[in-house]
C-alpha cells in the first residue's frame, strides 16, 4: 500500500511546491530589474552556503552543528526519498543512505525541539513553534517506511492501518517542509535563501575561491538622471527584485534584533520586524504571524499586501513608521549578524531617500543640516573659508601650493569641532615626527557627504562627492589618510562609482590608526613605551564592520605598552556609539541613550581610558554623564595616545632616522 501512497504524496507535494515557487517568483519580479549572472550565481551556491553562510552560523557552535544535521539531513533525505520511494529505486545502498540521512535529520530535529522549549525572546514563535514536530514527523516517518525497502521489515508489516498512519505522518512532514516551503511556511527561508545566495544584490560580499574575505558595504548610487527611476522606496515594487527575494529569505532567528543598538535603547526599530514588514507589505498578512517581537511600543496589525501599495509614509500611517527608519544608526550590526546575509541598512536608506527626496520629511535638525551642506559645504553652516582657522599656528602645507605629496591628509567633516581639532593636532604631530610628506586641501576640501547620504539626500551627496573628486583629480599623492572613519568609508568605497567614465580612484585610503601602525611597524615612528595604563578600545562601526579593520588600532596600543582590556561587545560585535547614520540629528527618543549603554560597557572593564578612532564616537562618548559616585572615564583618540607617547620618546640619531625613514617610505608606498 505504501508503494502506491508514497509516490503520490511525494510528487503531489513537489507539484504544489512548484506552483508556489512560480507564484512567489512572480511576486519578486514585481521589483525593479537587477541584472545577475544566473549560471555563475547558481554554481556558487554550495561555496556561499558552506563558507559564507556557515561562517556566521558557526559563531554559535551548537546551532551550527544542529543546522548541519537538520538541513543537511533534510536535503539528503528528500533527494533520496524521491529516488527510493518516488521512483522505486531501492536497490543497493540507496535505501541505507536514506536511513542514515533521515536518522541524521531526526537527531538534529531533537536539538531544534530542545531549543524551542524555552526559546530566547529574539526567536519568532507562531508557526515556527511547530517546526520541530514537522521535522521529526518527516524524518521518523521516512525512516520507518524505508525499513521494508532495505529488507529490515517485511513489506506488509503492520497491515493497511499502519500503512495509513505512516503515510499520514509523512504527509504532515511533506506539507510543512516541501509544500509549505513555497507557500509562506516556516521553511520558506530554505527555498528563498538558496536563491538569495545565488542572486544576491551584493555578490562581492562573498569570499572568493582563493579564500579571500568578501566585503561590499558602500551604498548603491541612485541614477538621478533617470526620470523614470523612483527616488528611493515607497512601495515594495520600488525595491530591486533580488532585495524582495532577500527579505523572503529571513529565517527570523532574531540575531539582528539582539545586536541592534536602537532596539536595545527602546527606540521604535526592530530590524527583524522591519524585514518581515517588507514581506507583509508584498504578500499581506498579520505581522504577528511573521515576527515574535514588535517594535518597542508599536502595535501589531495586519496588511492586505500589495507590491504596488505604499509601505512607508511621513506621518506613520503606512506599514513602516518614519520614526522606525530614522532610529537606525546604520551601524551594520544587523547585517554582520544575519546568517542569510540580508542587507537591512540598504533597505532603510532606500526608504529614507523617499522620505527626504520625494516628501521633504527629514525630522529633527535634518533639514537644517542638509540646507547647510548645500549652502556652505559643511553640516554646521560655518564659513567655508575658515576651515583652517584653528591651524593658523601649524603652517600646514596646502596641495594648491605643493601640488604633490606622499600623503593627502583629509581633515574630515568635524574640522569645525573644537574637540576634533585636538585630535587633528595630535595626528599632525605624529605625521611630522615620522617625517611624512603630507599636505591638506584646506578650503578646497568639502564635507565628504556621508551624513547627507545617510539622511537620504542622495542629490546633495553626489554633488559634494563630484566636486571633491574634481579637486582630488588635480593633485598627485600616494594615499589619503583621515582620522574620520565616515569620510574614510565614503572616500574608499562610495566615491569610486561617481568618477567620470574612464577614470578611477587610483589611490589607497587609510584610516589614521592603520597608517600609524604601518609607520610603527616599518620603524619610521619609533616609540618608547610609556607608563602602562589599563585601557579599552571602542571599535568605530565604519572602521570595523564596514571595512574590517580591527587589528591595527590594537597593535598601536600594544606598541604603546598599554594594558588592553576588551569590552564584552567588541570587534565585529562592538556596540555602536549612537553617532552614525544621522541619528543624533534626527534624534528619535527611546527609553535610554545608546552612548550611555556603551559607556556602561566601558565601566564594566574598569579601564582608566577608552580609546576611540572616530570624531563622532569621541563626541558621543564624552557627552555621557557618569552615574552618581562614578568618575568620568577619559575618552582619547588613538592619535592623542601616540602623540603623548612621542613626548617620552628620545629623538633618534640623524643617521638611523634617515635610514629608517628611507626604508619605511619604500614599504608604505609599495
UniProtKB/Swiss-Prot annotation:
| Binding residues for [4Fe-4S] cluster 2 | 260, 328, 331, 334
Q: Report membrane topology.
A: Multi-pass membrane protein
Q: Which UniProt keywords apply?
A: 4Fe-4S, Cell inner membrane, Cell membrane, Iron, Iron-sulfur, Membrane, Metal-binding, Oxidoreductase, Repeat, Transmembrane, Transmembrane helix
Q: Write down the Gene3D superfamilies for this protein, in alphabetical order.
A: Alpha-helical ferredoxin (1.10.1060.10)
Q: Which domain of life is it from?
A: Bacteria
Describe the disruption phenotype. Answer: Deletion mutant loses its ability to grow using DMG as the sole nitrogen source but is still capable of utilizing sarcosine and glycine as the sole nitrogen source.
Return the broad EC class: oxidoreductase
Can you quote the record's cofactor note? Binds 2 [4Fe-4S] cluster per subunit.
Q: Where is this chain compositionally biased, Polar residues type?
A: 659-670
Record's protein name: Probable membrane-anchored ferredoxin csal_0991
Q: Name its species.
A: Chromohalobacter salexigens (strain ATCC BAA-138 / DSM 3043 / CIP 106854 / NCIMB 13768 / 1H11)
Amino acid at each position: 500500500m505504501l508503494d502506491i501512497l508514497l509516490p503520490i504524496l511525494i510528487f503531489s507535494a513537489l507539484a504544489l511546491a512548484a506552483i508556489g515557487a512560480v507564484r512567489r517568483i512572480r511576486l519578486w519580479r514585481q521589483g525593479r530589474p537587477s541584472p545577475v549572472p544566473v549560471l555563475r550565481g547558481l554554481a556558487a551556491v554550495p561555496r556561499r552556503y558552506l563558507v559564507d553562510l556557515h561562517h556566521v552560523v558557526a559563531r554559535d557552535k551548537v546551532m551550527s552543528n544542529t543546522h548541519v544535521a537538520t538541513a543537511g539531513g533534510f536535503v539528503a533525505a528528500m533527494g533520496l526519498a524521491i529516488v527510493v520511494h518516488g521512483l522505486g529505486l531501492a536497490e543497493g545502498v540507496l535505501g541505507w543512505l536514506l536511513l542514515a540521512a533521515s536518522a541524521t535529520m531526526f537527531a538534529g530535529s531533537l536539538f531544534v525541539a530542545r531549543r524551542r522549549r524555552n526559546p530566547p525572546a529574539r526567536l519568532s514563535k507562531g508557526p515556527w513553534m511547530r517546526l520541530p514536530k514537522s521535522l521529526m514527523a518527516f524524518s521518523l516517518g521516512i525512516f520507518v517506511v524505508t525499513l521494508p525497502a532495505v529488507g529490515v521489515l517485511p513489506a506488509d508489516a503492520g497491515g493497511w492501518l499502519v500503512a495509513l498512519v505512516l503515510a499520514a505522518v509523512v504527509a504532515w512532514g511533506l506539507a510543512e517542509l516541501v509544500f509549505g516551503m513555497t507557500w509562506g511556511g516556516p521553511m520558506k527561508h530554505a527555498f528563498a535563501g538558496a536563491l538569495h545566495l545565488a542572486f544576491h544584490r551584493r555578490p562581492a560580499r562573498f569570499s572568493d575561491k582563493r579564500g579571500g574575505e568578501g566585503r561590499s558595504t558602500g551604498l548603491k548610487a541612485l541614477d538621478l538622471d533617470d526620470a523614470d527611476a523612483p527616488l528611493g522606496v515607497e512601495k515594495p515594487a520600488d525595491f530591486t527584485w533580488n532585495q524582495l527575494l532577500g527579505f523572503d529569505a529571513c529565517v527570523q532567528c532574531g540575531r539582528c534584533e539582539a545586536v541592534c543598538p536602537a532596539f536595545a535603547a527602546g527606540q521604535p526599530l526592530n530590524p527583524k520586524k522591519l524585514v518581515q514588514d517588507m514581506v507583509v507589505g508584498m504578500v499581506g498578512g498579520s505581522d504577528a504571524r511573521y515576527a515574535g517581537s514588535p517594535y518597542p511600543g508599536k502595535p501589531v496589525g495586519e496588511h492586505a499586501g500589495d507590491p504596488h501599495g505604499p509601505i512607508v509614509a511621513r506621518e506613520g500611517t503606512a506599514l513602516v513608521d518614519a520614526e522606525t527608519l530614522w532610529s537606525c544608526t546604520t551601524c551594520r550590526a544587523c547585517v554582520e549578524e544575519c546568517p542569510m546575509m540580508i542587507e537591512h541598512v540598504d533597505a532603510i536608506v532606500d526608504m529614507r531617500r523617499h522620505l527626504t527626496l520625494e516628501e521633504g520629511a527629514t525630522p529633527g535638525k535634518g533639514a537644517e543640516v542638509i540646507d547647510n551642506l548645500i549652502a556652505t559645504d559643511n553640516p554646521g553652516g560655518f564659513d567655508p573659508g575658515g576651515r583652517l582657522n584653528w591651524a593658523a599656528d601649524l603652517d600646514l602645507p596646502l596641495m594648491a601650493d605643493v601640488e604633490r605629496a606622499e600623503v593627502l591628509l583629509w581633515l574630515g567633516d568635524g574640522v569645525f569641532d573644537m574637540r576634533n581639532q585636538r585630535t587633528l593636532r595630535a595626528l599632525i604631530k605624529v605625521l611630522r615626527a615620522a617625517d611624512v610628506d603630507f599636505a591638506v586641501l584646506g578650503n578646497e576640501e568639502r564635507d565628504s557627504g556621508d551624513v547627507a547620504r545617510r539622511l537620504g539626500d542622495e542629490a546633495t551627496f553626489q554633488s559634494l562627492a563630484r566636486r571633491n573628486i574634481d579637486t582630488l583629480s588635480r593633485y598627485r599623492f600616494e594615499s589619503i589618510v583621515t582620522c574620520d572613519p565616515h569620510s574614510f568609508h565614503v572616500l574608499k568605497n562610495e566615491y569610486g562609482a561617481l568618477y567620470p567614465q574612464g577614470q578611477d580612484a587610483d589611490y589607497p585610503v587609510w584610516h589614521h590608526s592603520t597608517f600609524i601602525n604601518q609607520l610603527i611597524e616599518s620603524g619610521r615612528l619609533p616609540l618608547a613605551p610609556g607608563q602602562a595604563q589599563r585601557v579599552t578600545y571602542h571599535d568605530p562601526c565604519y572602521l570595523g564592520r564596514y571595512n574590517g579593520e580591527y587589528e591595527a588600532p590594537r597593535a598601536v596600543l600594544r606598541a604603546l605598552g598599554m594594558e588592553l582590556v576588551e569590552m564584552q561587545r567588541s570587534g565585529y560585535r562592538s556596540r555602536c556609539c549612537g553617532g552614525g547614520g544621522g541619528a543624533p540629528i534626527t534624534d528619535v527618543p527611546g527609553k535610554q541613550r545608546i552612548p550611555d549603554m556603551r559607556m556602561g560597557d566601558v565601566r564594566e572593564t574598569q579601564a582608566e581610558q577608552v580609546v576611540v578612532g572616530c570624531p563622532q564616537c569621541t563626541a558621543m562618548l564624552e557627552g555621557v554623564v557618569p552615574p552618581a559616585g562614578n568618575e568620568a572615564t577619559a575618552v582619547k583618540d588613538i592619535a592623542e595616545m601616540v602623540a603623548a607617547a612621542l613626548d617620552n620618546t628620545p629623538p633618534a640619531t640623524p643617521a638611523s632616522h634617515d635610514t629608517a625613514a628611507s626604508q619605511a617610505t619604500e614599504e608604505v608606498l609599495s
